[in-house]
Amino acid sequence: MNEQTAAALRRAQARLDSLDLYPRPVSLRRVRIWHVRWLFRLPWFRRFAGYTMWPLILLREPLHETSDDLVCHELCHVWQMQHHPLRMPLSYLYRGYSANPYEVEARAAVDATRR
């Protein structure tokens, strides 16, 4: 992992560590950030700037063009999956996106920790 990625994850981790959402703090072990612009050209992904799949954070734009708020939001999803590895991703099948409690929680985590 390069230093820019490590620094972005540490900043997001520090923000989330100030919250008491889950019994264990978010772990950065195995977390990776990939810039995959082509993925966000696919119809399902066009509306997103970032997407998380377990310890993998996928970004539309390069990390140096991505806000700390987005990295924090996506790392919150990593944290959620560390505690609910099946329930969290499956919730999108029956709750959808915007009203999904995990999305609401990730947006609230960003708002609560915004400087």
Task: State the predicted function of each range.
Residues 1-5, 9-18, 24, 72, ...:
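Anionic, Ser/Thr-rich low-complexity intrinsically disordered regions
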Residues 1-52, 56, 107, 112-115:
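Auxiliary, metal-adjacent structural segments of Zn-dependent hydrolase domains
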Residues 40-46, 53, 65, 69, ...:
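Post-HEXXH active-site segment of zinc metalloproteases
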Residues 56-76:
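Polar-ligand-bearing catalytic/cofactor-coordination segments
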